[in-house]
Amino acid sequence: MTSYALLHTQRVTAKNGEVFTISPDLWERNQQQQSLLLRYFALPLKEENNRLWLGVDSLSNLSACETIAFITGKPVEPILLESSQLKELLQQLTPNQMQVEEQVKFYQHQETHFEQEDDEPVIRLLNQIFESALQKNASDIHLETLADQFQVRFRIDGVLQPQPLISKIFANRIISRLKLLAKLDISENRLPQDGRFQFKTTFSDILDFRLSTLPTHWGEKIVLRAQQNKPVELSFSELGMTENQQQAFQRVLSQPQGLILVTGPTGSGKSISLYTALQWLNTPDKHIMTAEDPIEIELDGIIQSQINPQIGLDFNRLLRTFLRQDPDIIMLGEIRDEESAMIALRAAQTGHLVLSTLHTNDAISAISRLQQLGIQQYEIKNSLLLVIAQRLVRKLCSKCGGNLANSCDCHQGYRGRIGVYQFLHWQQNDYQTDFKNLRASGLEKVSQGITDEKEIERVLGKNL
């Protein structure tokens, strides 16, 4: 009987006293991970209820368990074995290969090279990251090279949440793989780069990713902005506006000309508010044009254009062209400078309804911001119909009610987000805010049991 066959009956006792029966069949079932297991000096001991028990010789090798868990999609339980015992078992499982020490050195040496034939673990690892991000509804994926680890974090409902750490030996290959997907220069790690690519999930969903790289002290950092390429429900009720706010917004949207601004920081939901307004306005008798960076949601019946600064196609050039295209409604992704502000105001004064965004903390600050961009007070009064300031707050989880129950997969007490709003509109020869500021709007959501005061404080701070 060969040493390989003897493994069918061989038992191994872990340092914690637990006894395992070694299964070559389990080793064979993990064939795609064998080079990875040898690289980490690790041995699969048992698989049960979709959980994998992994033998290692040191708790410092926990990153191996986390990486293999990511690749296999199974929780991994680390089991400490004697180093000599682990070496003997691995050697019996690979009798026709080089000595275990040489195999470990060989596979670890391979980590310094990006080789196509050894891409499978990296591809599986990235696929698992993408699938996990989709399942958790993450808007951004952060991949960060640290001193000893490669950190993965997902931004879920506006909050960064750490994911299992990955061994740093994968860092360069993951980064190179992502650069290949985004058609970037793999060899350039001294300068930031930006790119895009698509990923098809197990369930045939298409994810669009915007990729940004950044050189750091320990290596490159990558941030991926995820966007699902599928229909999105756009309705005022989903935004979280009150009935009065919805009606006020729709009344202003029904005006033939003027400027409507949505304000707030990055990630406050401004784009969704604009898309919802455009969808409500979208009828066959209206010519609607948008200038965006990038196009986040595709809307049938609307002419959407994306800026391309590399060839000189910026917001200002698109806006000037739009005015020669006989539009009824124009959406400008963002008013960024004096020129775009002037063009937007002139369009709003000459028979067009213009929608855009500004980065200001509240509604009233939008007026001073326009003045800083060179717009005169009388021009603002003649054109500006409505300013909506907004934020997104997390909703209490409908399963656990925010009680942070361990059995709930939200793990944070929250699931999903909803908007809180402040309206500033022209009324009786002056601009008037509606009766709610952002905090009052948020506290109303608290009284309705939608969110809690801690979340309002997190989003708004103490000054709003």
Swiss-Prot record:
CDD domains: PulE-GspE-like
Gene3D superfamilies (alphabetical): 3.30.450.90, P-loop containing nucleotide triphosphate hydrolases, Type II secretion system, protein E, N-terminal domain
PROSITE patterns listed in its UniProt record: T2SP_E
GO cellular component: plasma membrane
SUPFAM superfamilies for this protein: EspE N-terminal domain-like (SSF160246), P-loop containing nucleoside triphosphate hydrolases (SSF52540)
Annotated ATP binding sites: G264, P265, T266, G267, S268, G269, K270, S271
Entry's Gene Ontology molecular function annotations: ATP binding; ATP hydrolysis activity
Statement: the UniProt record of this protein carries the keyword Iron-sulfur: no
Assigned keywords, A-Z: ATP-binding, Nucleotide-binding, Transport
Pfam families (UniProt xref): MshEN (PF05157), T2SSE (PF00437)
Family the UniProt entry places it in: Belongs to the GSP E family.
Name this protein carries in UniProt: Protein transport protein HofB homolog
Native organism: Haemophilus influenzae (strain ATCC 51907 / DSM 11121 / KW20 / Rd)
Classification of source organism: Bacteria, Pseudomonadati, Pseudomonadota, Gammaproteobacteria, Pasteurellales
Gene of this entry: hofB
